Amino acid sequence: MRNTLKTAALVLALAAPTSPAEELTPDALVRTLSLEVLATIRRDKDIQAGNPKRIASLVEAKILPHFDFAHTARIAMGANWRRASPEQREQLVREFRTLLVRTYSSALMNYRDQVLEFKPLRAQPGDAQVTVRSEVRQSGAQAVSMDYEMEKTPSGWKVYDVKIGGASLAATYRDTFAEEVRNHGIEGLIDSLSSKNRQNDARRASINI
């Protein structure tokens, strides 16, 4: 239950805003996005029923555009990122993005009226990296801190990491990825991610038949 709460709350904070992202401060962006996705879930009966295709479409359209996956992949890969070729880096980012689609889609299926409470933003004008702090609250459960690490890019503010209870979401993959690289190399990691993503796509396709 605790993992479902934390992951679902991550999704709830990242839907598409009603105005261009670059016009909003980072905290206003995340707050606006959370309201947008809540409204989408509440009016879409297919999402509420757990329709995989509809949920994946919501994730693709409203959540993923607000992530810097290259930055997230660099954190997850650690020192191994420097060893990867440009082509391998591109493949890693693509497969990691697909992996997170699955994570967020699963979280949306388990949404149960969690609430986000935002903290005042501590940042200076001109800062290119900021932390948007919040807490996830649910009846009968302990509040969980959730901090969004964001950076300003030419296309607006992007999330590159989320810290849940102080633990980096991107860094949670680091040990697994490092072990895979030790055992099978970077190509082995890419193949492993690709295989898992294909298996998930096949399962989702069978559900939609």
State each model region's role.
Residues 161-209:
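Low-complexity, intrinsically disordered terminal/linker segments enriched in charged
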Residues 24, 43-46, 50-54, 83-87, ...:
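Surface-exposed, polar/charged faces of alpha-helical domains
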Residues 47, 53-54, 59-61, 65-67, ...:
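Short leucine-rich amphipathic alpha-helices used at interfaces
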Residues 23-104:
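Early exported N-terminus immediately downstream of N-terminal targeting peptides
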Residues 1-8:
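Bacterial N-terminal signal peptides that target proteins for export
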Residues 143-171:
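Short beta-strand edge/turn micro-motifs at domain boundaries
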Residues 102-144, 196-209:
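Surface-exposed, charged secondary-structure patches
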Residues 15-18:
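N-terminal signal peptide c-region/cleavage motif recognized by signal peptidases
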